[in-house]
Curated annotation (Swiss-Prot):
This is Gamma-glutamyl phosphate reductase. Catalyzes the NADPH-dependent reduction of L-glutamate 5-phosphate into L-glutamate 5-semialdehyde and phosphate. The product spontaneously undergoes cyclization to form 1-pyrroline-5-carboxylate. One of its GO terms (cellular component) is cytoplasm. It comes from the Bacteria. It comes from Bordetella avium (strain 197N). It is found in: Cytoplasm. InterPro entries: Ald_DH/histidinol_DH (IPR016161), Ald_DH_C (IPR016163), Ald_DH_N (IPR016162), Aldehyde_DH_dom (IPR015590), G-glutamylP_reductase_CS (IPR020593), Glu-5-SA_DH (IPR012134), GPR_dom (IPR000965). The keyword Electron transport does not apply. Belongs to the gamma-glutamyl phosphate reductase family.
Length: 419
């Protein structure tokens, strides 16, 4: 057995043991740990930023691009936000132990579902060290143990944050092994983590498409994931023109890099001649490059031609594919073929069209008269989220605390027997 395998197995064994204690942990103890972590982060800001400086120095030497350097940096503001996030999660209701509706059977037996932790969650992520705190806090609050494997470029930052998390757990008399940070940058550690079915119950990958595609191929442990966010907005013939303009503009320009950003705009042919030029003008003035079908190009002179590849691309930048469609059916066919199952929206005042779209578009989130950038756990009232899932099994859409739990059936009787 290699040293990496031994390291990972030890982490797994410790996490499994800690998960049993976390399953029993009270909401009060979990909240005490979270609040202790918040204080420790503020008090330890100088040490955190010193560790972060080591990562930044190495990243600059390796030519890391400015946008990624920004994500890696633990500024005063980001440290404050991590502490605030911990306090917010402490204030959320604890899902563990909650009971669903109770059904009383004809023999008087009472049947219900109880929320319980998943067990041990492996989380694999890139660049942003704040994910260490977000992920640890959500797993802790939902009664799970977790093994965190961050990007190699953030190793010093992640280890420093992991030490704070473990100190917070200890302060609340919870097992420090409930949150462990992988201390090696060897990629073999990831390969081992996603195959440890005896110790890990689920993997949550947060990163680029390449990372998630690789894990989907290699993993033997179930994944909660989304591969990409190729999101669509369809402007129906019955759309309010001003509302359509505002929604399309916000869906693309709110933040290019979020996974809910609109990547393809579909416009009904009946309103395309009047609506598309208005939307195109606003987006072009904002610096967005448009790539359209032949009908779109005829309506907006100078628009670049879209290739077939554009329809399936998550740009995460100031580029938008545009297509004029014959009707609602063609719009939904386009989404079914090219969409990623993440988030898709219709703009319409036609109730029947809205209901059909929500019923028939098979995405984890389907909107009516809203921009796709609302794809976020806070916006859904879930509080913090661990990520967004396009899976059909278990969690789907933004995954908050409840998504990090499962259920068991609990039955109560008075001595009934089965005849």
């Amino acid at each position: 057995m290699s040293s990496i395998e031994q390291i990972m197995l030890t982490l797994g064994e410790n996490a499994r043991q800690a998960s049993r204690a976390m399953m029993r942990a009270s909401g009060t103890a979990k909240n005490r740990a979270l609040l202790a972590m918040a204080e420790l982060i503020i008090d330890g800001k100088a040490a955190l930023q010193a560790a972060n400086a080591l990562d930044l120095e190495a990243a600059r030497a390796n030519g890391l691009e400015p946008a990624l350097l920004d994500r890696l940096t633990l500024s005063d503001r980001s440290v404050q936000l991590m502490a605030e996030g911990l306090r917010q999660i402490a204030a959320l209701p604890d899902p563990v132990g909650s009971l669903g509706p109770t059904q009383v059977r004809p023999n008087g037996m009472r049947v219900a579902q109880m929320r319980v932790p998943l067990g041990v969650i492996g989380i694999i992520y890139e660049s942003r060290p704040n994910v260490t705190i977000d992920a640890a806090a959500l797993c802790l609050k939902s009664g799970n143990a977790t093994i965190l494997r961050g990007g190699s470029e953030a190793l010093h930052s992640n280890l420093a944050l992991g030490a704070i998390v473990q100190a917070g757990l200890a302060a609340a008399e919870l097992p420090p092994a409930a949150v462990q940070v992988v201390s090696t940058t060897d990629r073999a550690a990831v390969g081992k983590l996603v195959t440890m079915t005896e110790h890990i119950d689920v993997i949550v990958p947060r990163g680029g498409k390449g990372l998630i595609a690789r894990l989907a191929q290699e993993a033997r442990v179930p994944l909660i994931k989304h591969l990409d966010g190729n999101c669509h907005v369809y402007i129906d013939a019955a759309a309010d023109p001003d509302r359509a303009l505002e929604i399309a503009f916000n869906a693309k320009t709110y933040r290019y890099g979020v996974c809910g950003s609109m990547e393809t705009l579909l416009v009904h042919r009946a309103i395309a001649p009047t609506q598309l030029p208005r939307i195109a003008r606003a987006l072009i003035e904002h610096g967005v490059e448009l790539r359209g079908c032949e009908r779109s190009q005829a309506i907006v002179p100078g628009m670049a031609a879209a290739s077939e590849e554009d329809w399936g691309t998550e740009y995460l930048g100031p580029v938008l594919a545009v297509r004029v469609v014959d009707d609602l059916d063609q719009a939904m066919e386009h989404i079914a073929r090219w969409g990623s199952g993440h988030t898709d929206a219709i703009v319409t005042e036609n109730l029947a069209a809205a209901q059909r779209f929500q019923r028939e578009v098979d995405s984890s989130s389907v909107y009516v008269n809203l921009p796709t950038v609302f794809a976020d756990g806070f916006e859904y009232g879930l509080g913090a989220e661990i990520g967004i899932s396009t899976n059909r099994l278990h969690a789907r859409g933004p995954v908050g605390l409840e998504g990090l739990t499962t259920y068991k059936w609990v039955l109560t009787g008075e001595g009934q027997t089965r005849g």
